[in-house]
Amino acid sequence: MSEKELLVPLDTYLASGIHIGTQQKTKDMEKFIYRVRSDGLYVLDVRKTDERLRIAAKFLARYEPEDILAVSRRIYTMGPLEEFGKYTGIRTVAGRFVPGTLTNPAYKGFMEPEVVFISDPRVDRQALKEATEIGVPIVGLCDTEHLTSFIDLVIPTNNKGKKAVALIYYLLTREYLKNRGVITDDTKLPFTYEEFLEKAANPKYRIIIQPKDKRRRRRRRK
């Protein structure tokens, strides 16, 4: 794949840090790794990330937005995730994923999605567990240290950095809408990468105390 065929210029990908992994790797993610740096950080192959973004957008576009559920508990991902939902109509859960959301019909927030999108297999493990139990396809953002045995479609990426997650969700939003036929011209988008970046760079949350176990949990302000 030449640079001209990428979704954005290679320099844009590199500037976002989308390729910067961690100092751990798993067998599952080995095929997406380009090299290891002298400081021990594994570097992801940008072209494989680009390829998987295209595949994921086409796959998700086969579903109506209300049949997709996208979730994330990572602070810097919540804002871009909500922008993703705002422009695509896809349902999102930014923050704590309540146990039983997909498996307990008695729960008032019960949902029956046809596909689930997660931002981190480890952080979003409750959503991953429930999606696996009900047998729906799972798309996930995965870094070099993740296990992917329950992920049907892996998007290899730095899923922790502000710029990286902002770019990922910007591109997913753009490509999903293009594949759905909602937009045809990249120059006439109703949103910008900078808008997604602003949401990632300025997370709004508050700390509350859970009455049962007294644990501190971060929640987004309304």
UniProtKB/Swiss-Prot annotation:
Q: Which residues form the signal peptide?
A: none
Q: Which domain of life is it from?
A: Archaea
Which molecular function GO terms apply here?
structural constituent of ribosome
Coiled-coil-forming residues are: none
Question: SUPFAM superfamilies attached here?
Answer: Ribosomal protein S2 (SSF52313)
Pfam families given in the database record? Ribosomal_S2
> What keywords were assigned to this record?
Ribonucleoprotein, Ribosomal protein
InterPro entries of this UniProt entry?
Ribosomal_uS2, Ribosomal_uS2_arc, Ribosomal_uS2_CS, Ribosomal_uS2_euk/arc, Ribosomal_uS2_flav_dom_sf
Q: Which GO terms describe its biological process?
A: ribosomal small subunit assembly; translation
A GO CC annotation recorded here is: cytosolic small ribosomal subunit
Q: Which family does it belong to?
A: Belongs to the universal ribosomal protein uS2 family.
Write down the NCBIfam families for this protein, in alphabetical order. uS2_euk_arch (TIGR01012)
Stated name of the protein = Small ribosomal subunit protein uS2
Q: What is the scientific name of the source organism?
A: Methanocaldococcus jannaschii (strain ATCC 43067 / DSM 2661 / JAL-1 / JCM 10045 / NBRC 100440)
